[in-house]
A protein has these predicted regions:
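Histone-fold and other basic nucleic-acid-binding segments
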Residues: 1-82
């Protein structure tokens, strides 16, 4: 069964290669695409919560950042540029 992802498998291949891999199997790229999509939906869902709580209809970058930090309990280092 071939599954369509929001992220292309080719893009995921490039991401894994950026991480230093010389070669990436199709199944590894597909699995990472599935996981990234799942994590992305979780972040988007949490960002929507922040948006609605603020009385807005538009999800903003600050909502996504806050959702990411809440879900992953990670504060970006001061040198991280957004």
């Amino acid at each position: 069964m071939v599954r369509e992802f929001e992220l292309s498998v080719a893009a995921v291949h490039r991401i894994v290669k950026k991480a230093g891999a010389e070669r990436v199997s199709e199944s590894a790229a597909s699995e990472l695409a599935r996981i990234l999509e799942e994590v992305g939906v979780d972040i988007a869902r949490e960002a929507l919560y922040f948006t609605l709580h603020a009385g807005r209809k538009t999800v903003r970058a600050k909502d996504v950042k806050a959702a990411y930090e809440k879900l992953f309990k990670f504060k970006r280092p001061y040198w991280f540029e957004s």
